[in-house]
Amino acid sequence: MYRLGSQGRSIQSQLQNGDSSSGRPLQLQGTGMREAQRIPQQLDYLLAEIISPNEDTNVIGYLAYYYPKLKNEQNVALLTDFFLRCPTYFSHSNVVSLRNNYPVMEAFNYIMTTKFKVSQPTVPFYRFYAAVLASLLNCEKTDPSHHWKLIPILTGVLLSIKGRDDVELYPDHSRSIKGSDTAVAQLLQRCLLRFYQSGDARSYDLNALVIISMSCALDYVEDDTIKKILYCFNYTRAIIDLIYYSPYGLNDSDIPLLSDSSVNSQSFDQLLNNNPALKHLNRLSFLFERTVKLNDGSIQSNLNDIDISLNKMQSFSEKLSKKISVLDDDSSKGVGQLLRQCLYASIIIHQAILTTFFQLDNADYTKYFLPSFSRKILSILFNLFFIVDRIGTGGFQPYNFVYLTCLQGIIQYDMKTAESLVKTFTTGINYSSLKDSEVARAKLLFTLNLMEQIVNICSDDLRLELIVPLVEDLVNNKNACVDIHNHVFKSIFESAHSVILKFFTVVDSSVKNVDYETNVTLVSEKIIPYLTLVIDQFPEFLSINQLDIAIETISRTVFPDSPIYSYDKNISSMFLNVLFNKCLTVDNDELVELPAIEAVVAPKNDEENNTSDAQDGGPKELQSLNDLKSRRSALISALISVFPLIPVKDYTKWLSIAFYDLIVATPERTERAFLQERLWDCVVGTNKYDPQKGNLGIMWWYENVNAQSTAKL
């Protein structure tokens, strides 16, 4: 079917005679009488289309269709040789278009993968592969200046390796195939070096094509090759420009998909197909990581390049956060997918930048550059946090590494920068749009998280004049722009509580810029009103676990061995009395509204309890705090949790109060059993670290509880 006709043989003859490397176009023969009597074959027509394509000729489509069907190696080599002379793609390096030439890479990935699946009955795959490789090697040999033509083809071939492995790991003639893989990788590296040594990188589109090709074939490019390339070309800036500012990438956030609510998933796929840098954001970020790691040039110069790159990324993030105010919940519209890729790429780049400081053996550079880089990266995360808030960071450890490293960098080397960031972020939030803007809420949440990290070590001015007033307004629902009854503010409300709890630990701080007496006095004044607030907001706004954490944190601040206890011992007594009185007076309301058929009504006596339990096969034992059904029981449990901290002189008194006044009076049988068990756990836990107090508790239990229930001892 695919034996050469007259035109094909003429072309093959010209190629074999070396005409393929000349500037003259190949001549199609067939004017003589004898030649005219021969019928051209399909391959002849294909070659004619390739050498003189019309504007609407889909050369790539023809290749993808015909390549796997060729029946002998000579035709495979001929088609490859001929394609390398196609004026649509390879007329001159100065007129290369990325959008036009990138499909070559995808085509050869498809061709090689498809051919591997249908190796028979046409040319076996290993021979097909060898023929393609031989043609590419011949092109390199006859004219080394054609290196730029080979790069996308070689990249496509290498991309197909994973697709082949997915089909069959150990095909026939695997040794020959592996040998061809190695030869292709070596040829690609030679072409990359020649490209950057020749000065062809001056062509923007061609250089972009090569950068994308290198990112796609990164697993097959050796470190030594990358180092040699870095001597010739500044990859750091080029990759950042390609990702964030080129029309083939994020285009300085000027992408219709980000502002047009009518787009759909088809538009997203089309966007990726038309913009190769967008399609390979992650690969480009890993290329950046590799080049930063291997760049052994001037440290000062490298860090300056990184600094410039971060400036560009920060500018992009600011524009992006202004462009997007609301994310559509319809995930099919592609905006979320694009933003997720943008975030991941940014984090990988930041991780690469920060990792360089762990490799530097120069404290001066670290001290000078790390705080500056950390400030810029945190500013970028501040602008992009709406993406993190939407998708979370579960399983994406690089984000945590970047965030915590930046925090440590500014706290350790430049605390003033950390404080400046808090002020900048706080003033950079559009509070009036918090209700409607997911981006604005995410910025506030990010700022609160940062406040939590530094509130107990920052200056008194920042803490007392900005942070504490802001979070107090939030938790007390006094901020006009935040309504805690609106579920969209739930995470902000909870984060504000976390900042206050962290603020209470300032009394344990030994930082020089903390006025000890001022802060101890302030905490002493605020801690009991805050305890009352927490109790009142449970369970409508705070969960049972959040209540437990808050009360445990407060108790450690007011009981013995704490500065507050040394300052005023009465505060611990007030703490216990407030919590106990709430346990006495609070309604026995259910924490969760159960379906009508499963509603639990607190029975009036044990006899009714036993009847109910018997109908259900016996009482169901509660396993955790979350099993508690009433607000009263949850508060009693929280009170019991602080008993290990109570002074020795008051310890048994409070055990008796909890048991007789609260636990015994609990109407629901299973909850009563749970609270009694929790009290016992408290006694045993106390004994582990304070035997004197623990012994008192055990003796108390033996005398008071064992006589009324199953003996623990």
From Swiss-Prot:
Keyword terms, alphabetized: Membrane, Peroxisome
Motif (Microbody targeting signal): 711-713
Reported induction: Induced in presence of methanol by the transcription factor MRX1 that binds the 5'-CYCC-3' consensus sequence within the PEX8 promoter.
Domain of life: Eukaryota
Ranges of biased composition (kind: Polar residues): 7-30
Stretches the record annotates as Disordered: 1-31
Membrane topology, from the record: Peripheral membrane protein
Phenotype caused by lack of the gene: Leads to a peroxisomal-deficient phenotype with the absence of peroxisomes and the accumulation of aberrant peroxisomal structures resembling 'membranous ghosts'.
Subcellular location: Peroxisome membrane
One cellular component term from this protein's GO annotations in UniProt: peroxisomal membrane
Binding partners and assembly: Interacts with PEX5 (via N-terminus).
Job of this protein: Essential component of the machinery required for the import of both PTS1 and PTS2 (and perhaps all) peroxisomal matrix proteins. Binding of PEX8 to the N-terminus of PEX5 cargo receptor induces a conformational change of the TPR domains and decrease their binding affinity to cargo, facilitating the release of the PTS1 proteins within the peroxisome.
Protein name stated in the entry: Peroxisomal biogenesis factor 8
Protein species of origin: Komagataella phaffii (strain GS115 / ATCC 20864)
Organism phylogeny: Eukaryota, Fungi, Dikarya, Ascomycota, Saccharomycotina
Gene name of the encoded protein: PEX8
